[in-house]
Amino acid sequence: IDRRQDYPELRTRLQQHLVETTSQLERLESVLKEMGESSSTLKDTALSMMGNFSAMMHAASSDEIIKNMLANNMFENFEIGTYKSLIAMCGRVGTPQAETLLRSSLTEEENMARWVDEHIEPVTLAFLARVAHESPEGRARMAQ
């Protein structure tokens, strides 16, 4: 998140979503507790996935912001699918409180996915403008 200083709106939204993600983990732990399950497997899986995602996010390259936006888009949609599956399971086993908690998380993920989707183009264009302004070739093209 700290490397997103050139994209303040993105940085702010990622910081907000980090807070949401912490709440989502707390909700998941509550759901597992309600169902008498251990959270260790869930935590291991979540930490593994987040580690892989984090590695993708931290791979430095000139176009990392574009790659990160695409990875965010993919990951948010993966989380949406996961929550929908968990909600279906809760409906089947009759755990309405768990379903309510998971729906809250699903809504947050859908909102984040929508935000990312709406910002892929503006972030891409901002990146291109920054590259054009910073490179000699880009400045020459802008002067024409």
Where in the sequence are the language-model features?
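Amphipathic alpha-helical hairpins
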Residues: 1-144
